[in-house]
C-alpha cells in the first residue's frame, strides 16, 4: 500500500515519491516547530491537513522516556518502531520532519532541551505540542512553555470523541459520577449506536447479557499480527545500555 494511502491521501506511488520531503539532517530555517510524542501518531490529526514548508515536525527518542521507569522491551521497540514509520509517512506526504534517534549525537536526551536547540537552530519563533495523556509530560511541557517564553500552540490529540475538559463539565455540581450517564450523553451527541433518538436494540445497555459466558462453540477470531524487523532498534538499545525487562523476537515483531 503506498504510504500516502495509509495517511489518507489516496494517491499513487509515483506522486508520493515526487513530493516526499528529504530527511533534515541539519534543521533548516522554520517559522514554527511542532512536537509529536510517541503516543500521538494520529495520521488523521488536523495538523496534517495542510503542508507548510515553514513548519518543522519533531519526533525524538530520548533517555528521559526510556529511563524514568523500567519498561518492557516490547513496549520500547513498539514505540520507536512506530515513531520511525510515522516520520516516514509524514515526509512522504510532503511535511518537514526532524527525527532524533536515541544515538543521534545532537540528542540531549531531554525533550525540553532538544526543543531549545532546535528552536535556536531553525530560528523558529513559535512552537506547538499536542496535549499529553500523561500528567508527568503534561506538566513538563507546561513548565517549558512558561520558562521558554515563546508563543506556544497547544492542540488536542484528537484521539477521542471528547476533549480533555468535557467530562469535568458534564459532572460539574453532580454528587455521583456515573459512567452510564456519560455513555448515554456521548451516544446522543454523536449518534453512535443510535436509531434517531433511540438506542439501537431498544435499550441503553446490555450489561446483564454481557455478563454471560460465550457459547462453547464460539471461536474467537485470530489476532491481527504483523511481522516487523526491529533488530536495528534493539541493537541500538543494547549498545547504549537502555535497561528493559522481558524478551522479544525483534526480527519478527508482531505489532
Where are these predicted regions, by residue range?
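Acidic-and-aromatic substrate-binding clefts and catalytic sites of carbohydrate-active enzymes
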Residues: 103-109
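Short, contiguous clusters of charged residues that form electrostatic/catalytic patches at enzyme active sites
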Residues: 81-84, 109-113
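Residue-identity detector for glycine
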Residues: 8-12
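Beta-rich, aromatic/charged-enriched effector core domains that present basic-aromatic interfaces
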Residues: 110-255
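N-terminal beta-strand-loop-alpha-helix module at the start
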Residues: 17-102
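Extreme N-terminal basic, low-complexity initiation segments
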Residues: 2-7
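Short strand-loop junctions, especially beta-strand C-caps/beta-turns
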Residues: 102-103, 132
